[in-house]
Amino acid sequence: MSRLAKKPIVLPQGVTVEIKDNVVKVKGPKGELSQEFLPYVKIEVEGNEVWVRPNENQIIRKSDWRKIKMFQGTYWSLIRNMVVGVTEGYKKELEIVGIGYRAQLQGNTVVMNLGYAHPVVYEIPSDVKIEVPAPNRIVVSGIDKQRVGQVAAEIRAFRPPNVYTGKGIRYVGEVVRQKEGKKA
């Protein structure tokens, strides 16, 4: 049994979990998330706890246990992330480093000047909220951890930090190791 799945996911006040077929829906104060799971594990709601247990019907060979234990831990983490997302939400902060590098919101897009000959325009997805509190800072927030991380990674990919100068878009708190330049 997965070490994570040995303990239940405790549901906070105001969070409900529905399981129909292999789809888990989590509703909370910030919104609703749903995820489809494979039938390797049984997901059960008991009071205000969610248990992820192995599905004995899926075990044909002894070697299937390893696969089922892997899915059990993964699904436990995914459901836990959904519960945290609908209660607290997720947030990633990016900082833009470089002279003349800046970002601004224009309607449903983020327009970034990143040292290219043209401004970079990124359209904001509907399930994620983006704020620009300062010209050199971008805050990506939402209820789905995977989507928030994906959008932040897409924005960072427009100009990742340069290993020689450190210029570019980086996560707040990210340490960029700089290489030494050429020796003359």
From Swiss-Prot:
One of its GO terms (molecular function) is structural constituent of ribosome. Keywords: Ribonucleoprotein, Ribosomal protein, RNA-binding, rRNA-binding. It comes from the Bacteria. One of its GO terms (biological process) is cytoplasmic translation. GO terms for cellular component: cytosolic large ribosomal subunit. Pfam families: Ribosomal_L6. InterPro entries: Ribosomal_uL6-like, Ribosomal_uL6-like_a/b-dom_sf, Ribosomal_uL6_a/b-dom, Ribosomal_uL6_bac-type. NCBIfam families: L6_bact (TIGR03654). Belongs to the universal ribosomal protein uL6 family. Part of the 50S ribosomal subunit. This protein binds to the 23S rRNA, and is important in its secondary structure. It is located near the subunit interface in the base of the L7/L12 stalk, and near the tRNA binding site of the peptidyltransferase center. This is Large ribosomal subunit protein uL6. It comes from Thermotoga petrophila (strain ATCC BAA-488 / DSM 13995 / JCM 10881 / RKU-1). The gene is rplF.
